From Swiss-Prot:
Membrane topology (UniProt): Multi-pass membrane protein
Entry protein name: Cytochrome c biogenesis protein CcsA
Taxonomic lineage from the root: Eukaryota, Viridiplantae, Streptophyta, Embryophyta, Tracheophyta
Species annotation: Lolium perenne (Perennial ryegrass)
Keywords assigned: Chloroplast, Cytochrome c-type biogenesis, Membrane, Plastid, Thylakoid, Transmembrane, Transmembrane helix
GO MF, one example: heme binding
């Protein structure tokens, strides 16, 4: 009972804090004079991280196994993984474009996890025999870390497409303030442009947009490369575990099939980066398609509750 109460408190603290962080981001986006509030949002993300970490540790202690046995626990872990990605630019002292992706993604995953749809999964249960293995933590954690990483990289690629073709979208048309550009700190370039007007340094209209898209493209490539590596490790660990549990390394289960499709899509993306004719818009399009594939692989199969990987699915639990 004590652990359940602690989990409930920590879960709601993390969700409330990340909601405040999102609000601060929106305020600083609309009111430039309040840019100093960004420090508060970073502190909020730290509070969120420790709250989610405390939740996972508490869940682990109460259940006796790492909390990755159902959709609810995996969503909480996914939120935790998104924060880890959020801190990478901080460590490298780089411009934190990732925060524009990781912060909203964290609140969405956290929000769905705490919604009424997954209430029956909130109580920790004993693992079914097939999941009582040392491979549970290794395989599932690697897969979820890869999902979080690939989702962020895919969204960065989608942002590149929107910036390059924003005139084709009503929301991002020139008649309106381009929220996306401001979100990625594109205002920095306006300051530089105004300072260059009084100098002899040449400039051209699309130079600043080019700098932004190149920076996002670089981040997208690095993040997806990391995610692809984690996905490969996760699939290999799963194959070894499958051989121990079911006597076969690969069964073309729906989850396995979509994991293979996901791996193939991002392998195509990485290969397209080596071809100058595909690098840029074409590779970003491939990565954006990968975003949908990941959600089908991770979320769609769990909702349907089919195949050998249906443990902890929404349908099975709701029955």
């Amino acid at each position: 009972m004590l652990f359940a109460t602690l989990e409930h408190i920590l879960n709601h603290i993390s969700f409330s804090t990340i909601s405040i962080v999102i609000t601060i981001h929106l305020i600083t986006l609309l009111v430039h004079e309040l840019g100093g509030l960004r420090d508060s949002s970073e502190k909020g993300m730290i509070v969120t991280f420790f709250s989610i970490t405390g939740f996972l540790v508490s869940r682990w202690a109460s259940s006796g196994h790492f909390p990755l046995s159902n959709l609810y626990e995996s969503l909480i872990f996914l939120s935790w993984a998104l924060y880890i990605l959020h801190t990478i630019p901080k460590i490298q002292n780089s411009k934190n474009d990732l925060s524009t992706i990781t912060t909203p993604s964290t609140i969405l995953t956290q929000g769905f996890a705490t919604s009424g749809l997954l209430t029956e999964m909130h109580q920790s249960t004993i693992l079914v025999p097939a999941l009582q293995s040392q491979w549970l933590m290794m395989h599932v954690s690697m897969m979820l870390l890869s999902y979080a990483t690939l989702l962020c990289g895919s969204l960065l690629s989608a942002a590149i497409l929107i910036i390059r073709f924003r005139n084709n979208f009503f929301f991002f048309s020139k008649k309106k303030k381009n929220v996306l550009l401001k979100t990625f700190f594109f205002s920095d370039f306006y300051v530089k442009r105004s300072s260059l007007k009084s100098t002899s340094v040449p400039s051209f209209p699309n130079y600043y947009k080019y700098q932004l898209t190149e920076r996002l493209d670089s981040w997208s490539y690095r993040v997806i490369s990391l995610g692809f590596t984690l996905l490969t490790i996760g699939i290999l660990c799963g194959a070894v575990w499958a051989n121990d549990a079911w006597g076969s390394y690969w069964n073309w289960d729906p989850k396995e099939t979509w994991a293979f499709i996901t791996w193939t899509i991002f392998a195509i993306y990485l290969h397209s980066r080596t071809n100058l004719n595909w690098k840029g818009t074409n590779s970003a399009l491939v990565a954006s398609i990968g975003f949908l594939i990941i959600w089908i692989c991770y979320f769609g199969i769990n909702l349907l509750g089919i195949g050998l990987h249906s443990y902890g699915s929404f349908i099975l639990t709701s029955k």
